[in-house]
């Protein structure tokens, strides 16, 4: 009985360590770090993914919170960017073969998405980023106070600008 209780406690602790979406805590943290720091997606998309990037960004970034992209589509956009738009490609082999939208750099005639300013991402990082976005950003609608505090911390006053979650 004692072992069973211990095992149940361990299971409960393991489940509590998960971000609540099936994504392992380490993978979740890695995806978030890639979004906020390594790939600096927040520069254009905003720290909340709402398209409100920093003032120096090119502007016009997608509001990921309103997006309906699935995981495979996100991986394609992150890897290949969007031809003719400011969205960069993070796969260093993008457009060297037909992996990106079935086309090559030569066929696009100069409309290849810009190369990221300082980094490319290995496939695993692209997948971690997509998984993080699916878990915490894509299709989530307007930012809530609770999400703001989860991301920025409890003591950030600007989080009070967002509506609190209300429910039954």
Question: What feature does the model see in each segment?
Answer:
Residues 18-24:
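Sec/Tat signal peptide C-region and signal peptidase I cleavage site
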Residues 63-64, 86:
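Conserved beta-strand positions that form and line the central face of beta-propeller blades
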Residues 43:
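Short, cysteine/histidine-rich loop/knuckle motifs that typically chelate Zn2+
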Residues 25-29, 37-39, 47, 85-168:
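Flexible coil segments in periplasmic/lumen-exposed cytochrome c-class electron-transfer proteins
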Residues 50-51:
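Short, non-ligating residues that shape and space the ligands of small metal-coordination modules
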Residues 9-18:
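Bacterial N-terminal signal peptides
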Residues 2-9:
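Bacterial N-terminal signal peptides that target proteins for export
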Residues 54-56:
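Conserved catalytic-core motifs of eukaryotic protein kinase domains, centered on the activation segment
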């Amino acid at each position: 009985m004692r072992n069973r209780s211990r095992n149940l406690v361990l299971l409960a602790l393991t489940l509590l360590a998960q971000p609540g979406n099936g994504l392992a805590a380490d993978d979740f943290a890695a995806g978030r770090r890639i979004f906020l720091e390594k790939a600096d997606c927040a520069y254009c998309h905003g720290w909340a993914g709402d398209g409100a990037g920093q003032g120096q960004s090119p502007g016009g970034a997608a509001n990921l919170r309103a997006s309906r992209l699935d995981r495979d589509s996100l991986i394609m956009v992150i890897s290949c960017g969007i031809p003719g738009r400011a969205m960069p490609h993070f796969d260093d082999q993008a457009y060297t073969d037909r992996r990106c939208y079935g086309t090559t750099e030569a066929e696009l005639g100069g409309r290849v998405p810009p190369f990221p300013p300082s980094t490319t991402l290995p496939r695993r990082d692209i997948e971690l980023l997509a998984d993080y976005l699916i878990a915490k950003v894509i299709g989530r609608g307007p930012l809530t106070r609770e999400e703001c505090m989860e991301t920025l911390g409890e003591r950030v006053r600007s989080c009070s600008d967002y509506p609190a979650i209300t429910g039954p």
